[in-house]
């Protein structure tokens, strides 16, 4: 069986596989091919990939049309899907709820498409959960980005020239990204507060040394996979009123709120921004999914009323080597789980709990229940 790892687009600093992961795949008995210069953004040479057992492809189209499995980070262009051979497997982030035409093209082309966003959040699948591995690094990168935009230091400093008070950081949304943002801001010495619509995360916030902000918005729920469910308009308004005072007292606000399969909720309004101190910084981690913050623009720094609003669509790419490392490990763990060493192929059983959750198309049909519900 041959796996092909193509280069990502010009805007992506991460790569889908590092040489060390190539070695692990080769040891399973898999033929690994990577596109020439795949590691250029990380200053990794083709020679290093070959030393770990990979073949180098200088003809992307030919490799796409001849490989049994194609692994990448970002979704392909629709035209590229038509190059991929029938009955092969394609694995990447696909954004299937917003890319229905792409999903339909995979089905028409008779390609089994696995969406890494849809890996179930169950214990057995944790090692394959790329959404969490990337969100974790994104939370770290968000705090580092905020510190570089802020004209204050994060920790308290007691000097002969006077005492510098610690930076106040407010994290909205306590999922994987939010928890890492809390931990990173605390390690940098900031005073941290956090809010989430799920009251059950309060203990996690406190365990990291942060204060959980209590805002009564009535009864809230979460999905089976642990994501917050969408709030009503009344609940969002109550939430915004409760957060306005906290934002006004904060030097940094980081929003991480996402609703699985839906546009990100608009949480920080222009009214809240205008109540904040000049020089404050807002990091909108949900900007690529519609954004949590009024006025945030993807991959731009916007200054409004003295407040810097930062919307970065690829925060894990700020720590591209580590993001590539863990993503490659996620892919390897997924492939290893279903590798049939005797027959040298993947055992594709859709009755399996993980595969039934993440396989979007198979045998010419859209087979994922959640995606089918959105068509």
Task: Describe these PLM feature segments.
Residues 7-44, 155-246:
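Glycine-rich phosphate/diphosphate-binding loop of Rossmann-like nucleotide-binding domains
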Residues 117-118, 123-160, 287, 293-375:
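Adenosine-phosphate binding glycine-rich loop
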Residues 12-16, 79-83, 92, 226, ...:
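Glycine/threonine-rich flexible loop motifs
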Residues 97-123, 262-316:
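Rossmann-fold NAD(P)-binding glycine/threonine-rich loop
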Residues 1-105, 109:
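An N-terminal-biased, well-structured beta-alpha scaffold segment characteristic
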Residues 54-68, 75-76, 222-253, 257-270, ...:
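A structured beta-alpha segment of the ubiquitous adenosine-cofactor-binding alpha/beta core
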Residues 2, 8, 78-168:
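Glycine/serine-rich phosphate-binding loop and adjoining beta1-alpha1 elements at the start
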């Amino acid at each position: 069986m041959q796996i092909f790892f193509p280069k990502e687009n010009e805007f992506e600093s991460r790569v889908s596989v590092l040489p060390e992961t190539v070695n692990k795949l080769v040891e399973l008995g898999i033929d690994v091919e990577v596109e020439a210069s795949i590691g250029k953004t990380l200053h990794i040479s083709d020679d290093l990939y070959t030393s770990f057992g990979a073949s180098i492809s200088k003809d992307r189209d030919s490799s796409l049309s001849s490989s049994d499995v194609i692994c990448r980070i970002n979704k392909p262009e629709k035209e590229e899907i038509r190059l991929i051979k029938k009955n092969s497997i394609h694995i990447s982030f696909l954004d299937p709820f917003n890319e229905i035409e792409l999903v339909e093209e995979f089905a028409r082309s008779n390609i089994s498409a696995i969406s890494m966003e849809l890996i179930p959040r169950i214990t057995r699948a944790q090692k394959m959960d790329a959404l969490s591995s990337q969100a974790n690094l994104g939370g770290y990168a968000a705090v580092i980005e905020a510190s570089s935009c802020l004209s204050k230091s994060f920790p308290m400093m007691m000097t002969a020239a006077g005492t510098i008070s610690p930076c106040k950081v407010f994290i909205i949304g306590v999922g994987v990204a939010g928890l890492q943002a809390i931990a990173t801001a605390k390690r940098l010495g900031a005073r941290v507060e956090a809010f989430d619509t799920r009251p059950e995360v309060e203990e996690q916030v406190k365990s990291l040394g942060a204060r959980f902000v209590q805002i009564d918005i009535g009864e809230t729920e979460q999905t089976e996979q642990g994501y917050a469910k969408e709030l009503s308009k009344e609940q969002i308004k109550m939430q915004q009123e409760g957060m306005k005072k906290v934002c006004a007292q904060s030097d940094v606000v980081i929003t991480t709120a996402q609703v699985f399969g839906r546009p990100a909720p608009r949480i920080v309004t222009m009214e809240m921004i205008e109540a904040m101190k000049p020089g404050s910084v807002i990091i909108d981690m949900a900007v690529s999914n519609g954004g949590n913050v009024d006025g945030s623009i993807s991959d731009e720094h916007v200054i409004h009323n003295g407040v810097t609003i930062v919307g970065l669509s690829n925060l894990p790419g700020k720590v591209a080597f580590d993001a590539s490392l863990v993503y490659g490990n996620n892919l390897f763990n997924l492939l290893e789980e279903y590798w049939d060493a005797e027959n040298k192929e993947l055992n594709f059983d859709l009755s399996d709990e993980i595969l039934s959750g993440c396989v979007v198309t198979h045998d010419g049909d859209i087979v994922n229940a959640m995606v089918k519900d959105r068509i």
